[in-house]
Amino acid sequence: MTMDTAQLKSQIQQYLVESGNYELISNELKARLLQEGWVDKVKDLTKSEMNINESTNFTQILSTVEPKALEIVSDSTRETVLKQIREFLEGIVDTQ
C-alpha cells in the first residue's frame, strides 16, 4: 500500500512539530535572515512595491515581492537550512 504525497507531507510536518525540529529549523532560519539583513531588505522591497503600484492589495504585493525575497536569501543560509531538513528527513524516511 502506498501513501499519497499529501499524507506523507502531513506526517512529516506532524513529526517535525512533535519532535521539536520544526522550531529548531525555524529559529535557525529566522536568526540567519535577521543577521544578514534579509528582513530589512524585504521590508524595503515591500515599501517600494507599494509606492510604485500604489497598491495595498496583499495578494498582488506578495506575488511581486515573494520571488525577489526568495532570490535574495544567501546561499549559505539556504544550504544550511536545506542540510538541516535533509538530515531530519534521512532520520525518519527509509530511502532504500
From Swiss-Prot:
Its main location: nucleus. There is a cross-link at K68 (Glycyl lysine isopeptide (Lys-Gly) (interchain with G-Cter in ubiquitin)). One of its GO terms (biological process) is transcription elongation by RNA polymerase II. The keyword Protein transport applies. Gene3D superfamilies: 1.10.246.140. InterPro entries: TF_ENY2, TF_EnY2_sf. Keywords: Activator, Chromatin regulator, Cytoplasm, Isopeptide bond, mRNA transport, Nucleus, Protein transport, Transcription, Transcription regulation, Translocation, Transport, Ubl conjugation. GO terms for molecular function: transcription coactivator activity. One of its GO terms (cellular component) is nuclear pore. Involved in mRNA export coupled transcription activation by association with both the TREX-2 and the SAGA complexes. At the promoters, SAGA is required for recruitment of the basal transcription machinery. It influences RNA polymerase II transcriptional activity through different activities such as TBP interaction and promoter selectivity, interaction with transcription activators, and chromatin modification through histone acetylation and deubiquitination. Belongs to the ENY2 family. PANTHER family: ENHANCER OF YELLOW 2 TRANSCRIPTION FACTOR (PTHR12514). Component of the nuclear pore complex (NPC)-associated TREX-2 complex (transcription and export complex 2), composed of at least SUS1, SAC3, THP1, SEM1, and CDC31. TREX-2 contains 2 SUS1 chains. The TREX-2 complex interacts with the nucleoporin NUP1. Component of the 1.8 MDa SAGA transcription coactivator-HAT complex. SAGA is built of 5 distinct domains with specialized functions. Within the SAGA complex, SUS1, SGF11, SGF73 and UBP8 form an additional subcomplex of SAGA called the DUB module (deubiquitination module). Interacts directly with THP1, SAC3, SGF11, and with the RNA polymerase II. This is Transcription and mRNA export factor SUS1. It comes from Saccharomyces cerevisiae (strain YJM789). The gene is SUS1.
